[in-house]
Every structure is written in structure tokens, then in C-alpha cells.
Swiss-Prot record:
Keywords tagged on the record: ATP-binding, DNA damage, DNA repair, DNA-binding, Nucleotide-binding
Name this protein carries in UniProt: DNA mismatch repair protein MutS
Similarity comment: family membership: Belongs to the DNA mismatch repair MutS family.
Example of a GO MF term: damaged DNA binding
HAMAP family recorded: MutS
BP terms from Gene Ontology: mismatch repair
Length: 855
């Protein structure tokens, strides 16, 4: 210990020792009933948690140091706030009883909590990325629910893949350059680790699971063990003895799911609305689950819809059976309503963090699981038969908990009052002593009087001597030899016996020993329960599936939804379809039909803003998605084809912070769609081309439609305000025009929200502006200008560098720039340039011209 540390108080010297070991963490240092933060940590804690910043002496000749603290019993609330802000928190705990400590209390860092490892709250999980060529080896571990998966993902698909999981922290090799968008789009906390950490993690993973290779878990790429090992080792290194049960890793196989990239998830507003509101999301509106397991299963299924007719129909069959057997559905819901989140209980119990009450919750939930198994025996659907056969009877675990713990135990495990009478004979004896101390002493006193014949003998107590036997001087001659003298008084002698000392020890230490013994018995119970947690986890997964299916059934009953026919053909036909989210919050919702066929597979939908174009095309996407989850739909009838992907381009989801213009964002999205869509895909395009000039937008939109028609053949819905696109119906195969109907009145227009064949009569932009409340003067002026523009027939907008007259008027710098652009255009090899590449070239040229003109 250096001179500087010697000058510190012993407690602060101990603090410095641990802080030096965890310099990148906020160190919560246990002092009595508080966790304290010191120095810079205190300043951060005060700012982030709104705590009062105080100070304390640091040692002889030293200035006072900043400090602030939080009560230990509510520390998790404060830790959650820090972790959500991206901080790591090290917990430095007292590891011995302060009352028994000789000198300063022993402390140790028992756990490090990071954004991806705070499993007390369902805040998210931990991910590891390990680059291999043009792909990433990805692992995801969610400690709160025991989910551990791995996959090999192409670099261009990485963001879409990660967006399916609730990831808070990413582990990477030190110096690893991640895709630029990753942190900004997904808002992740990055933790860099040395290369050796990945190698050592791999060895630790294989050793702990007792396998020579991760191929034993079903993985094909051996290098994935580096990524899996990193998250595994990181979790164990940070959580130490509190590490929850980590299941064996499983391969993530996406071949069985409809592809939904991040744009589709945002565009269809699956987990949150475009404005970021979760209460307006599809998930929130359709959720009728009753357990945490079911809720997570529903969310996962919405993000990973089935791409298998067989799996969809099995779910539909189960949903339909529950609808037809309403009493059974009610019984299932009644059973699930009181069930705890078993996946989270497994995590907490295995990490030694579960309270006695949580074990009671486990007992009650296991009893309910057995009730559920009996209810499922009343059903005939294949899924329910499979689940019934796979649900394990864990009454033995429930019985053990029931036999050991009282029905309403205290919240904290060391408070006593946990264990039922009859579990442990010594505990029963201690409790009897505690509750009958005075009676026991009187009985012993009576026994001694009888043995000695000294009727004046009495047992007394003081703080100095403890319990004693007092005999008057006149009766000393009758005292037995086994009495040991303790004290002489003027008129009496005080004695003790071995039996009295044993009784005294039991009485005085009874409560302490009761608490210690109850804690030991609780730990033994927990260890027995931990042995069965794999089986509990198995049941949790199955119960989540039941909850997911009953949620679909209850929703269909509640809303009057109809079973769609999901088929392997091409046509998509919806009769009187509704958007489930918009219908939820709208009175007198107007349903619409959809008919996409091999002959008419591209629908160009025109109409003014606010007429319902965007809502309608999203509606088709949402209904298609729901059908692939096995859900019934808000329709009169529907034939939904199996799709391999749903693509959307809806501009409101642009991430402008990336420094890319709206137009470039749009072109990148369209490029992704045109490069990856197949004939089995569903494409939803909303106002493509609005990020550039009118004629550029029209040209690009026409080229996109033509490419989809000729090269892809995917079912496509294109909402646009460009009426010029409607001429494609005559020129391009598969195009059909539709519009959102508007009624014109003397007061203006009225939106009918009805989809009809044909093109819109006009854009009605000025009418919409009037409805929006623009001043009458502005509306009149706009109408006047519109008439003037409409009168200038034959005039067309052209780019300046194509006009000979303009060339003559520009200065030399501009002329050189335009000639350079023209030269580049002339050098384009049209024969070897795909439409997608042409769009990107056009977008780049447009950006350069815009930048030059602004100069």
C-alpha cells in the first residue's frame, strides 16, 4: 500500500482497491443500509439519478470527497436507470456480518451489471458479433428469459436480423469496424474485447457443456463457437455467482420464416408506430396473451411469421377448435391468468436471486401447468395433443416447495418465518424455545427445587452474567456438587449449571439461529428446485405456445375475425378487409377489397393526401403478415398466398441522422427491394420518387414498375400522387389502376376512404390545404397560380444542362461541370447496366447537381 493510500481512511483505501479493478464501471459500495458512490462516480450518479451530492472526509490532511447514495433495498430501480443510459455498474457488497467483523468489514465485487446483463428487468439481451469474410457470426443471449441462439448472417442483412431481437449490448473484437448504420439505427451499446476473450470463451463453453464441438448443438459452422463463447463467458464473468441458468445454444434457422427487414417492421408498425408509440402498434392491438411467455411468443411470431402452409394450418386448426369450444377456451384463460412468468422465474431462481415468494409463485404455476395439461386433453388439434404429451408433471417440485415454505413468506430470505413447522426438528425446538423461554426457565427452576429441596432457589438474569441460579446463604449447604459458583453476594450465592448454560445459549441465540437455519433450509430447497429447472423451462415454452394460440382465438371471438384461406398459389384476394390498428381507434371504419392476380399483380393507387392510400396498402401488408402467423383476420373472406418476404418503402421511417438525404434513402430502399424480391414476395411502395423533382420522380417510379413487371413479377401495391403513372396500365403488363374515392361538394372535398377502379380525378392538393386550415387568402392565391400553370400547355421541365441556350449563359466553371456530367452520362454502358444500378447512378448524379447549384 502506497503512502497516498495510507493517508486515506481504511474504508476509502478499500474502495480504491476495488475501483482500480473496475475503472470502467460505476462502483456501488455497500455501507450499512446504503450503496454509496464516491468521487467522479458520485457526480455522475447525482446527475443521472437526481440524487443530492454530499461529501465526506477522505483522511488526515485530505479534502472532503463527493459522495451520494441509494438505499440497498431499492437499488435495482436506480441501477435500471443507469444501465438504460449505457453505464456499467459494479456491486461491491459486504461479504461478512458487520457485527462479527474484526476491523473493516470484508467486501468484494459480487457482480457487474451491464446494459445486456441486467436480467432482473426484461430490458434486453446480449449479442456478440464476430466477422468472418463478408458475414458475421452472431450470438444472442437473453439472461432474463433463458434464450441463447447463434447464426451466420450476411453483412447486408445484419441490421435486419438484429432488429428482430431486443438487444442492448454488443460484444466485438477490439478495433473491429462495424457497419456505420448499426449503432445509430439500433441504438446499441458496444463493448470491445480482446481477441483472446473470444478464444477463451469458446474453450469455456465447450468444457462447461461437455462437448467437443458446437456441432453437438446442431451448428454447422465451427467458428460460430467464438461468438457463442464470447457471450457465454462475458455473462459468467460479469454475473459471477449470480449467473442464471444458461441453456444450450440453438441454431437460428430463418428458412422457415417470412422475411421482414427493418423497413418492413417499421413500415407495418409491428412493434411501435412510425411516431414511436407502442400503444398504436400492431402487437399492442392484437395482444390477448395472459403470460410473459405468451407475450414474447406473440411478438416473436409477428416478427418471424411462418413460411410453411403446414405450420400455419396447424395453428389455424387449433385456433378454430378453441373458438368452437368456448368453455374450454375460458378454462384455459382462467388457468393462465394466475400463472407467473416461468421463463423469468427460471432465470431468477437459478441465479440465487429469487425471493421465497417467487418460489411460492413457481409452486402455484406448476400446479396450474398440471391443470392446463388436463384441460388440453379435452382438445383434438394436433398442436394441443403434442403440447399435452410434452408438458411434464412437476408436482414433485411443487410438493417439495409446499411442504417446506409457508404459504405467505416474507419478501427477504434472511428475515425468518419462511419454513413450515415439522420440516426440521432442531428448527422446531429453537422456535419452541423462543416462544416459551419464560416457561422453560420456570420448569427448570421447579426441577431444581425438587432435586435440591431448596424452595427459595430462583433463576434470574442480568446483562453482565446472563442467567444464574440464586441460593440464600442459609441454603448453601444443600447446593449439589454440579452447581458452579459465579458470584458471591452479602446474603446469597449465584451459580450456574451446564444445563442452564445450554438453555441460556438456546434462548439468547434462538432468533439468530432460527434465521440462519431457515436460510440454510431455503438454500437446500432452492438447490433441489434448480435441478428441475430445465424441465420447468421446457414447460414454460409449451405454455407460451398455448397462450399464443388462445390469444389468437380470443381476439377472433372478440372481434368477429374470420379464418383466411392460406394457399400455395399466387392470387391474393381480400373481401372487406380492415386495418386492425386503424379500426381499433376509428369509428365507422370503411373496409376495402383487394384482388391481386397473375393478370393484375401491380396496383397503382392514386388519390389526394389523407384519402387513405397509405393506410390501405399497409392494411394489405398487415393482413398478409397476420395470416402467416395463423391468425384470423378482420375480413369478410380472404385468400392469402404464401409469401417469402414482405418489403415496404414508406418514407416516414428514414433515419436522417445517418447523413443520407431522403431521396438517397429512398433509392437505397428500392434497390434493396428490387435486388431481393421474388415472385412470391409482397411489395408495398408509398409515394416513391417524392424526394426529387416531379419529372425525375415520375420517371423513376415508371422504371420501377416496369422492372417489377418484367423481371420480378411480385405482387405490388404502389400508392402515388403522380397521376402520370396511371398511363402504365396501358403499357406495362400486370398494372391495374385504383383510386381512393373523393366526393366533391360546394364546401370542398369529402374523403370516402373507398377504393375504386380507375385513376383519381385529380390530386386535390389545394382542397386538402383548405381542409388543413390554411388562410383563405393563401388558398385563393394557390388556385390562381394553379390555373396559370395549367394554361402553360406543352411546357416541360428539363434539367438545365440539356438546354443549349442555358449553356451559352453560364460561366466557365458551370460549363465545365455540366460537360463533365454529360460525359459521364455518355460513357454509361446501357447494355450492361441493370435498372437498379441505373437508379443509383441517377440518384448520385442528381445529388451532385443539387450540391453544385446550391453553391
Amino acid at each position: 500500500m502506497g503512502k497516498e493510500e495510507k493517508e486515506l481512511t481504511p474504508m476509502l483505501a478499500q474502495y480504491h482497491q476495488f475501483k482500480s479493478m473496475y475503472p470502467d464501471c460505476l462502483l456501488l459500495f455497500r455501507l450499512g443500509d446504503f450503496y454509496e458512490l464516491f468521487y467522479e462516480d458520485a457526480v455522475v450518479g447525482s446527475k443521472e439519478l437526481g440524487l443530492v451530492l454530499t461529501s465526506r472526509p477522505a483522511g488526515k490532511g485530505r479534502e472532503r470527497i463527493p459522495m451520494c447514495g441509494v438505499p440497498y433495498h431499492s437499488a435495482n430501480n436506480y441501477i435500471a436507470k443507469l444501465v438504460n443510459k449505457g453505464y456499467k455498474v459494479a456491486i461491491c457488497e459486504q461479504v461478512e456480518d458487520p457485527s462479527k467483523a474484526k476491523g473493516i468489514v470484508k467486501r468484494d465485487v459480487i457482480r457487474v451489471i451491464t446494459p445486456g446483463t441486467f436480467f432482473e428487468r426484461e430490458t434486453g439481451g446480449l449479442c456478440s458479433l464476430y466477422r468472418k469474410g463478408k458475414s458475421y457470426l452472431v450470438s444472442y443471449l437473453n439472461l432474463s428469459v433463458g434464450e441463447f441462439i447463434g447464426a451466420k448472417v450476411k453483412e447486408e442483412e445484419l441490421i435486419d436480423f438484429l432488429s428482430k431481437f431486443n438487444i442492448r449490448e454488443v460484444l466485438v473484437k477490439k478495433g473491429e469496424k462495424l457497419p456505420e448504420k448499426l449503432e445509430k439505427v439500433l441504438k446499441l451499446h458496444i463493448t470491445e474485447l480482446e481477441e483472446e476473450f473470444f478464444e477463451e470463451g469458446k474453450e469455456e463453453l465447450l468444457k462447461d457443456y461437455g462437448v467437443p464441438s458446437i456441432k453437438a448443438f446442431g451448428f454447422q459452422d465451427e467458428d460460430l463457437s467464438l461468438s457463442l463463447g464470447a457471450v457465454y463467458r462475458y455473462a459468467k464473468a460479469t454475473q459471477k455467482s449470480f449467473t442464471p441458468l444458461i441453456p444450450k445454444p440453438k441454431p437460428y434457422v430463418d428458412e422457415g420464416y417470412v422475411k421482414l427487414d427493418l423497413k418492413a417492421v417499421k413500415g407495418l408498425e409491428i412493434t411501435e408506430s412510425i411516431e414511436g408509440r407502442k400503444d398504436l402498434s400492431l402487437f399492442k392491438v392484437v395482444d390477448r396473451t395472459l403470460t410473459g411467455m405468451g407475450r414474447r411468443r406473440l411478438r416473436f411470431r409477428l416478427l418471424n411469421p411462418f413460411r410453411s402452409i403446414e405450420r400455419i394450418r396447424k395453428v389455424q386448426e387449433a385456433v378454430e377448435e378453441l373458438i368452437n369450444k368456448r368453455e374450454v377456451l375460458n378454462e384455459i384463460r382462467k388457468t393462465l391468468e394466475g400463472m407467473s412468468d416461468l421463463e423469468r422465474l427460471v432465470s431468477r431462481i437459478s441465479s440465487n436471486m429469487a425471493s421465497p415468494r417467487e418460489l411460492i409463485h413457481l409452486k402455484n404455476s406448476l400446479r396450474k401447468a398440471e391443470e392446463l395439461r388436463k384441460i388440453l386433453s379435452l382438445l383434438d388439434s394436433e398442436i394441443f395433443k403434442e403440447i399435452e404429451g410434452s408438458l411434464l408433471n412437476l408436482n414433485k417440485v411443487a410438493d417439495l416447495i409446499d411442504k417446506t415454505l409457508v404459504d405467505d413468506p416474507p419478501l427477504h430470505v434472511k428475515e425468518g418465518g419462511l419454513i413450515k413447522p415439522g420440516v426440521n426438528a432442531y428448527l422446531d425446538e429453537l422456535r419452541f424455545i423462543r416462544e416459551n423461554a419464560e416457561k422453560l426457565l420456570k420448569e427448570y427452576e421447579k426441577k431444581l427445587k425438587k432435586e435440591t429441596g431448596i424452595q427459595s432457589l430462583k433463576i434470574g438474569y442480568n446483562k453482565v452474567m446472563g442467567y444464574y441460579i440464586e441460593v440464600t446463604k442459609a441454603n448453601v449447604k444443600y447446593v449439589p456438587e454440579h452447581f458452579r459458583r459465579r458470584q458471591t453476594l452479602s446474603n446469597a450465592e449465584r451459580y450456574t449449571t451446564e444445563e442452564l448454560q445450554r438453555l441460556e445459549e438456546k434462548i439468547l441465540s434462538a432468533q439468530t439461529r432460527i434465521n440462519e437455519l431457515e436460510y440454510e433450509l431455503y438454500r437446500e430447497l432452492r438447490e433441489e428446485v434448480v435441478k428441475e429447472l430445465d424441465k420447468v423451462g421446457n414447460n414454460a415454452t409449451l405454455i407460451g405456445e398455448v397462450d399464443y394460440i388462445q390469444s389468437l382465438a380470443w381476439l377472433a371471438l372478440e372481434k368477429g375475425w374470420v379464418k383466411p384461406e392460406v394457399h400455395e398459389g399466387y392470387e391474393l384476394i381480400i373481401e372487406e378487409g380492415k386495418h386492425p390498428v386503424i379500426e381499433e381507434f376509428t369509428k365507422n371504419y370503411v373496409p376495402n377489397d383487394t384482388k391481386l392476380t397473375e393478370e393484375e399483380f401491380i396496383h397503382v393507387i392514386t388519390g389526394p393526401n389523407m384519402a387513405g392510400k397509405s393506410s390501405y396498402i399497409r392494411q394489405v401488408g398487415v393482413l398478409t403478415l397476420l395470416a402467416h402467423t395463423g391468425s384470423f383476420l378482420p375480413v369478410k373472406s380472404a385468400r392469402i398466398p404464401l409469401v417469402d418476404a414482405i418489403f415496404t418503402r414508406i418514407g416516414s421511417g428514414d433515419v436522417l441522422a445517418l447523413g443520407v438525404s431522403t431521396f438517397m434513402n429512398e433509392m437505397l430502399d428500392v434497390s434493396n427491394i428490387l435486388n431481393n424480391a421474388t415472385k412470391r414476395s409482397l411489395i408495398i411502395l408509398d409515394e416513391v420518387g417524392r424526394g426529387t423533382s416531379t419529372y425525375d420522380g415520375i420517371a423513376i417510379s415508371k422504371a420501377i414498375v416496369k422492372y417489377i413487371s418484367e423481371k420480378i413479377g411480385a405482387k405490388t401495391l404502389l400508392a402515388t400522387h403522380y397521376l402520370e403513372l396511371t398511363e402504365l396500365e396501358r403499357k406495362v403488363k400486370g398494372v391495374k389502376n385504383y383510386h381512393m374515392e373523393v366526393e366533391e361538394t360546394d364546401e370542398g372535398i369529402r374523403f370516402l376512404y373507398i377504393l375504386k377502379e380507375g385513376r383519381a380525378k385529380g390530386s386535390f392538393g389545394i382542397d386538402v390545404a383548405k381542409l388543413a386550415g390554411l388562410p383563405e387568402e393563401v388558398v385563393r392565391e394557390a388556385k390562381k397560380i394553379l390555373k396559370e400553370l395549367e394554361g402553360e400547355k406543352g411546357k416541360q421541365e428539363v434539367l438545365p444542362f440539356l438546354e443549349e441556350t442555358y449553356k451559352k449563359s453560364v460561366d466557365e466553371e458551370k460549363l465545365n461541370f455540366y460537360e463533365e456530367i454529360i460525359k459521364e452520362i455518355e460513357e454509361i454502358d446501357i447494355g450492361n447496366t441493370t435498372p437498379v444500378k441505373a437508379l443509383l447512378i441517377l440518384a448520385e448524379l442528381k445529388e451532385r447537381i443539387k450540391s453544385f447549384i446550391k453553391r
